[in-house]
Amino acid sequence: MTTSTDTTPILFPAYEHPIKMVVCDLDGTLVQSDLNVSDAVLDTIQAVSQAGVKVVIATGRMFPSALPYVKRLGLDTPVICYQGAIVRDSQADFALRYSNPVPLDLAKEIVGYCQSQGIHINVYVNDVLHSQPHDIYVDEYKRTSSIEPVLLDDVLSILQADAPPKMVVINNDPAVLEAVRGYLLETYGAERIGVCKSRHNFLELTAPDVSKWSAVVALAEQWGILPQEVMCLGDEENDVAMLAGDGLGLAMANGPLAVQRKAKGIVPHILEDGAAQAMRHYVLAK
């Protein structure tokens, strides 16, 4: 069950259940704008792990982009990536635990529409990013993700056999993103395509039942952990499902107010190591 609070956010709200699993978004939650993770966050996550609490990364990033951070944080837990469309082991052969891609025919239609409108769209297939050349967004995406894209004049050509776990429309004009969102939901409906923002200029497209929270619940169940025993930390629209779920959902103070209002409470700004403060408050101080 997912609840919607829409109330004034409370800093460090009281919570009665023990925390046995901590789920963290990356960008804007653990990873700062300079792409670094503070020593306080690193040290706190290691202490939480050593206390026997599961720490899991749940990100919109593709697996190869998330894995270096998982390693740096010293985690050996599975990685929830592509907004929850893929869950992979972070050890050994990176075994695929779960996959729920966008249906291939639907992906083709959406990519065809974006290309016909001159709208940038990233397509992810088999952990490889495919994008258009000569595009102002390519270099910026490479910088923030540390991923080298395969550049194709016709991105549609990659959608032959394997369906993408997600696609991302990128545009610095919010009106363009909202127009694309409106078109997709009007044309296909929320029952066929999932649409949410992960950054101010990223519109994420997934299968409709994909979310970080659904992947979190599935992992927690495998470990015998109740949803109420999970703490989730995030900052953007793509985190709302897990912030409003049955666990302790805490929004970063640096995130949009609309996101904060969906959470159980808030924690300080990322530059104040809000995620680390939350873990110390709800896990290490108990």
Residue ranges and their predicted role:
Residues 12-13, 17-21, 38, 203-286:
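Mg2+-dependent phosphoryl-transfer enzymes with acidic/Ser/Thr/Gly-rich catalytic loops
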Residues 36-138:
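Active-site phosphate-binding/coordination module
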Residues 41, 66-70, 180, 184, ...:
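Hydrophobic packing residues within well-ordered alpha-helices of enzyme cores
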Residues 48, 59, 83, 167, ...:
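Residue-level signal for inorganic ion chemistry
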Residues 117-120, 124-233, 237, 242:
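Conserved acidic, metal-coordinating active-site core of Asp-based
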